[in-house]
Amino acid sequence: MMRRRRLLLSALAVLAVSACGQPDTDMSNGKFATPKDAALYQAAARGDLAQARQLLAEGASLNSRNVRAMTPLDVAMVEGNRRAFESLLELGTDPTWLGDARDTSMHFAAKLPDSYWLKALLKRGFSTEVKNRLGETPLFPALGTSTQANVQLLLDAGANVHVRSKDGRTLLHQAAMIGSFDDIPRLLDLGVDPRAVNEAGHTFQRYFFMGPRNPETEKKVRAWLSVHGIAVEDQM
């Protein structure tokens, strides 16, 4: 899980360096799949929808993915380019499209610290329940210390907290596995099943008690489990 975060940060750093690049530079650093896609992004960044539509008619794609499996919409979010972002949505980009990638743009937005992107997508009515290749909804990548605003946005939009991934993980499992321990008391209060086991046969407690954690959070979790008659599994 931490490796995924490191890969995302690496992609953010590479794209930030090239944020002002022209189409040829964008191609050389792998930011876009084809020259037409690079030109499409540049047109969107200028707000030139007529030129962008012409490029789409000539074969450019809103759904192309670069060497990091990022769509033009993902690139816009990473670069902080709101004009490109809004233009691409106006042109018909679907942030719930998965294709052959691991994540949709909804998942990508959910893991970014700047909540502007996810808020904008939710405001446009895109689903909170779209699943990635692992069967995760955007709530899974939204968990974490730097993305609490995204968790709240998804909850406010009615996201299902009882969802499970293909390998049986609940949001409690996810929070414990990535070390986002402060999310756990809230998820318990929201009704996520603490008895649920994943494909490996473990409840979230297996991952919560196996590593370093905040003493105050641990105290809250132990108290919650005790009040609800659930045995503490701290002897692994």
Range-by-range predicted roles:
Residues 42-47, 75-81, 108-114, 141-147, ...:
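Ankyrin repeat A-helix N-terminal signature
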Residues 18-19:
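C-terminal motif of bacterial Sec signal peptides marking the signal peptidase cleavage site
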Residues 194-233:
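Leucine-rich solenoid repeat scaffolds
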Residues 48-56, 81-90, 114-123, 147-155, ...:
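Ankyrin repeat structural motif
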Residues 4-9:
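N-terminal export leaders
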